[in-house]
Amino acid sequence: MGLALGLFLIVIAATGSAIAFYKEMERALNAHMRMVEPQPQGWTLQDALKIRARLEAQDPHSSVFSLQLPQNSDEALFARVMPAIDPKSGREYALDYDELFANPYNGERLGRRRIGAATFHLEGLPSFLYYLHYALFLPFGAGILLIGILGLVWLVESMTGFWLTLPARPKKSKKGASPRPFHQRWASAWKIERKGNTNRLLFDLHRAPGLWLWPLLAIFAITGFALNLGGPYAHTVQRIAAYEHFQEAPPRETLPQPLINPPINWFKAAELGQRYFAQQAQREGFTLGKPAAIEYRRDLGLYFFLMHTSRDLLDAQGRPTETDSPATAATIAIDARDGRFVGLQLPTGQRAGNTLTSWLIALHVTAVGGRVWQVVVACFGLAVVLGCVTGLWLWWRRRVLR
């Protein structure tokens, strides 16, 4: 198990080091899709929803189910796409892309892609690394499941490794001398001895960084589980703390049949979302920022309207955290059948489990801490690679000696 985990972690940690700068990579390599020229007239939420409808109409086989709204004037509109359902057969159409980019000012379609698609073009590198990091390029569901399980295994392995570094209980001295204090006997595990032989150096390189970085190991192992297996994570956290996540543990059961054309359309859902947020802000005592995203789950018959609020985590510049899936934004769930308010989910200050999870995930995806934290995460990934490589080398040396 440890051998397989080490091999997988090398890939996960190496790609994680790179995508710590995912946003910068996207801006550098995909400026034609990600960046636009700011216009003085600006754009409105209604404009964005009209563009969404236009994008969907351009390909009747597509269903634009998620719209992420730009937070800066030079950013493109980002949409997630899934196959539409053929009304005759009841099956999904074949679709060779799942992301769309458009100019929020004029609706111009800037590009499309399938996340993680293998390509020899540099513009596909960020998406490829991102997909490799969280799905190992296995079929979508299998890769995500495997990474989630590996997160748990990694946590257990890390705890076991930490325990193994603890010094053994000292034997009683016949001469009655007092044993060295615990911290002195443990100190050697935290050091890298450069004067020893190669095996000792490799062992220290495997052990010492793991001790120094153990808090980060625990954070990234837990969040790897949370990001990939959100449902089991939600059910686990709910046993020990108040926690709610509409996407991973929906507030209602899956419908018998997908609700394709709901009575409440996107425009009405956005209107209701803003109204409900104004009511909840007054009730819960938070202030409202910009709308972050709007999504529709046809399997649940629910809209999710996301908005930045004073309960958001903030980045190094004091702005609300923002990723391709703004999980740290507040979310309101709306029934697509009658427009009923279903629930509110705040990133902080509402439920202890949500507050802790928001912080952990924001650290994982480098949404907080600015450039300094990005560098820390990148270096941490390289340290994990070093620990795995030295561990595999030591295993191989022992096997040869046997």
Give the label of every model feature segment.
Residues 1-402:
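Conserved histidines in hydrophobic membrane contexts and catalytic metal-binding motifs
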